[in-house]
Every structure is written in structure tokens, then in C-alpha cells.
Amino acid sequence: MTNIRKTHPLLKIVNHSLIDLPTPSNISAWWNFGSLLGLCLIIQILTGLFLAMHYTSDTLTAFSSVTHICRDVNYGWLIRYLHANGASMFFICLYMHVGRGIYYGSYTYLETWNIGIILLFAVMATAFMGYVLPWGQMSFWGATVITNLLSAIPYIGSTLVEWIWGGFSVDKATLTRFFAFHFILPFIIAALVMVHLLFLHETGSNNPSGIPSDSDKIPFHPYYTIKDALGFLALILLLLLLVLFSPDLLGDPDNYTPANPLNTTPHIKPEWYFLFAYAILRSIPNKLGGVLALVMSILVLAIIPLLHMSKQRSMMFRPISQILFWVLVADLLTLTWIGGQPVEHPFITIGQVASILYFTIILILMPLASLIENKILKW
């Protein structure tokens, strides 16, 4: 008798995706982040669902309802902080996952890569709208500043902003619609994840060497199920350390002050995971230029496959590209630091230099390094 997992229509899909999936035998811990992102998404949807049961999306009661969740709901504080810090873990895993894709040349799987970019935008949009919901000072002013950027779009800008706001300022209508979108988007993300995996399983996983591994595949279960389980354990440990010991470490104290349209916070800044993009936005003294640079800081990922000049797929055997990659990582950390600093003398210049360097490395230096490495191969 054939095993039910190989014949049952539903179990067959699970079997081909998680059990009998042929997987390269040499993929490293950098390949754990895909499954960790899946875990993060599940954690966020579950904690978010329980928060939505107690939250009210009204300007008068939103802040109080979050306080009520933390004080009066059973383990409400835990659910709230798991959700808030879960978002941070989500972005750590996201950036690691994208970094892995760039380093090992996974972007040559075009469909998988492009769906991944769409997923990145969707997660960023969801996180932004979620940050507005507690209706603290930083929520309100963050929403005002970021939505206002759309007014830089020629001709339709102002109309578009008022349409998104549902009025002439960020108010009740804005909060209500942001809550609606924040609730629905994770499910759209989950659907996109399925498409992402569908395209990935068409080609199979890449591996650190970048060399086709069809001749050396092993079943996903038990080898990678146990490896993923270890990753899950590490992620949950890290998340619980954050939630139980310093839940507000990554948050902003301004968000413990209820939103007040008459009082602007001195330093408006987004959550830490958007600071690099915010620094790029601020480093251009022109509104439209800044917005374009902001969008391009993520969209540049879509151009990376077109700029792949190397004869090798992975950076494993390409020392010049490796150095550039780690300089890019250092540059992104610098931008993250600058994004959290006030707009004054040394920080403005550092931000501008770091922004130029970011685009220069990706668009010019990396393709050049690839061509040099191709030449070295012939020696």
C-alpha cells in the first residue's frame, strides 16, 4: 500500500514541499531565514488576531485600548510586546534573507526574487500602518510625515494624500482604514508567500557554492526539518529575551504620549528597521528627489539580476565582491544610525556620503568587481 502522504491530494502538496522535497546537501544556516520568516508571519498573525479582539480603531479610544490590553487583559502585555518585538525579529530575518540572496546569487531565480521584492514592500507597508495604530505621538506624526511624502508626486500628489487621509489631516478616518489594511495585508502576504514558494520549488534551492546540485540532493525531512527546528528555537529564545527583559528597547518613548496634533515631537523618526531608508530620504534636500531615492533604495533590488556580470553565481569564490558586500552591510548600518540622529552638521554629511555609497556599490562597483574577477579567472 502506498503511503497516504503520497496519494492524498492535500497531503501530497505538503509532502512535496516539506517532506520529500529534494534539497541541496550543503545549504548553510543562511538558508534558515526563509522558514524563520514563515514562523514570524504566523506569530504576527496570531498575536495580531488576539490584539484586534481588544483594540478599538477610534482616535478617542485607540491609545486607551492599548493601555487596557497591557493592564487588564490576561497576558495582554505579553501579546502586545510579542507583536511589537515580533515585527523587529521579522525585519532582522528579512534583511538577513535578502542579504543571503545577494551574496549567494539567489536573485538569478527571477520570479522568486521579484515576488520576494513585492513581499518586502507589502511587509514594510503593513509594519508602517501597524505603527500608527497605538495612536501615540510618534504614531501620529510618523503617519503625517510619511503619507505627506506622496504630495511630492506631480499633479495628483495633494489629492492623493487627502484621499488616503480621508480628510484634510490624519484623523479618525485614517486610523480606521489603516487598521483595516493592517488586518488584511498579512493574509495577502501569506498568499504571496505561497506563490514565492511555488516559484522556488520550480527550480529548487540554490546553495552556497552557486553550482547546480542536482547530483547531490537529500530529502528535506528529517535533515532540514530538524535544522529549521533549531532555528525556530533560537528565534523564539531571542524574541522572549527581548519581550521579557527589555520590551521597550527598540520602541520610542514618545509613543507613550497620546497623539496630539497641536504638539509636534522634536525628532520624528520611524521604527529602527526603516531608519536606513529614512536616512536616504533625508539626505536629499528636494522633496520629490528624496521620495524617489526612498523608493529606489528598495527597488534597486529588482535591478541587481540585470547587473550580474560574473561568470560565477555565488560570491563564495569572489573575494573582491565579498569585500564590497560587507562594505555595503557596514554602509547600511551607518545609514540606520544616521536615520535616528537629528538633522544637524556632521550627521547630514555622513548621511549623504553613505547614501551615495549605497547606490554606487550596488549599481557601479559590484558589476565592475565582477568583470575584474572574470579577468582574474583567465590568468
UniProtKB/Swiss-Prot annotation:
<feature type="transmembrane region" description="Helical">
    <location>
        <begin position="77"/>
        <end position="98"/>
    </location>
</feature>
<dbReference type="InterPro" id="IPR036150">
    <property type="entry name" value="Cyt_b/b6_C_sf"/>
</dbReference>
<keyword id="KW-0679">Respiratory chain</keyword>
<comment type="subunit">
    <text>The cytochrome bc1 complex contains 11 subunits: 3 respiratory subunits (MT-CYB, CYC1 and UQCRFS1), 2 core proteins (UQCRC1 and UQCRC2) and 6 low-molecular weight proteins (UQCRH/QCR6, UQCRB/QCR7, UQCRQ/QCR8, UQCR10/QCR9, UQCR11/QCR10 and a cleavage product of UQCRFS1). This cytochrome bc1 complex then forms a dimer.</text>
</comment>
<keyword id="KW-0812">Transmembrane</keyword>
<dbReference type="InterPro" id="IPR048260">
    <property type="entry name" value="Cytochrome_b_C_euk/bac"/>
</dbReference>
<keyword id="KW-0496">Mitochondrion</keyword>
<keyword id="KW-0472">Membrane</keyword>
<dbReference type="Pfam" id="PF00032">
    <property type="entry name" value="Cytochrom_B_C"/>
</dbReference>
<feature type="binding site" description="axial binding residue">
    <location>
        <position position="182"/>
    </location>
    <ligand>
        <name>heme b b562</name>
    </ligand>
</feature>
<comment type="function">
    <text>Component of the ubiquinol-cytochrome c reductase complex (complex III or cytochrome b-c1 complex) that is part of the mitochondrial respiratory chain. The b-c1 complex mediates electron transfer from ubiquinol to cytochrome c. Contributes to the generation of a proton gradient across the mitochondrial membrane that is then used for ATP synthesis.</text>
</comment>
<dbReference type="InterPro" id="IPR005797">
    <property type="entry name" value="Cyt_b/b6_N"/>
</dbReference>
<dbReference type="InterPro" id="IPR005798">
    <property type="entry name" value="Cyt_b/b6_C"/>
</dbReference>
<keyword id="KW-0830">Ubiquinone</keyword>
<feature type="transmembrane region" description="Helical">
    <location>
        <begin position="288"/>
        <end position="308"/>
    </location>
</feature>
<dbReference type="InterPro" id="IPR027387">
    <property type="entry name" value="Cytb/b6-like_sf"/>
</dbReference>
<protein>
    <recommendedName>
        <fullName>Cytochrome b</fullName>
    </recommendedName>
</protein>
<keyword id="KW-0349">Heme</keyword>
<dbReference type="GO" id="GO:0008121">
    <property type="term" value="F:ubiquinol-cytochrome-c reductase activity"/>
</dbReference>
<feature type="transmembrane region" description="Helical">
    <location>
        <begin position="320"/>
        <end position="340"/>
    </location>
</feature>
<dbReference type="InterPro" id="IPR016174">
    <property type="entry name" value="Di-haem_cyt_TM"/>
</dbReference>
<feature type="transmembrane region" description="Helical">
    <location>
        <begin position="347"/>
        <end position="367"/>
    </location>
</feature>
<feature type="binding site" description="axial binding residue">
    <location>
        <position position="83"/>
    </location>
    <ligand>
        <name>heme b b562</name>
    </ligand>
</feature>
<keyword id="KW-0408">Iron</keyword>
<feature type="binding site" description="axial binding residue">
    <location>
        <position position="196"/>
    </location>
    <ligand>
        <name>heme b b566</name>
    </ligand>
</feature>
<feature type="transmembrane region" description="Helical">
    <location>
        <begin position="33"/>
        <end position="53"/>
    </location>
</feature>
<dbReference type="GO" id="GO:0006122">
    <property type="term" value="P:mitochondrial electron transport, ubiquinol to cytochrome c"/>
</dbReference>
<keyword id="KW-0813">Transport</keyword>
<dbReference type="InterPro" id="IPR030689">
    <property type="entry name" value="Cytochrome_b"/>
</dbReference>
<dbReference type="InterPro" id="IPR048259">
    <property type="entry name" value="Cytochrome_b_N_euk/bac"/>
</dbReference>
<keyword id="KW-0999">Mitochondrion inner membrane</keyword>
<dbReference type="GO" id="GO:0005743">
    <property type="term" value="C:mitochondrial inner membrane"/>
</dbReference>
<feature type="transmembrane region" description="Helical">
    <location>
        <begin position="178"/>
        <end position="198"/>
    </location>
</feature>
<dbReference type="GO" id="GO:0046872">
    <property type="term" value="F:metal ion binding"/>
</dbReference>
<feature type="transmembrane region" description="Helical">
    <location>
        <begin position="226"/>
        <end position="246"/>
    </location>
</feature>
<dbReference type="Pfam" id="PF00033">
    <property type="entry name" value="Cytochrome_B"/>
</dbReference>
<keyword id="KW-1133">Transmembrane helix</keyword>
<comment type="similarity">
    <text>Belongs to the cytochrome b family.</text>
</comment>
<keyword id="KW-0479">Metal-binding</keyword>
<feature type="transmembrane region" description="Helical">
    <location>
        <begin position="113"/>
        <end position="133"/>
    </location>
</feature>
<feature type="binding site" description="axial binding residue">
    <location>
        <position position="97"/>
    </location>
    <ligand>
        <name>heme b b566</name>
    </ligand>
</feature>
<feature type="binding site">
    <location>
        <position position="201"/>
    </location>
    <ligand>
        <name>a ubiquinone</name>
    </ligand>
</feature>
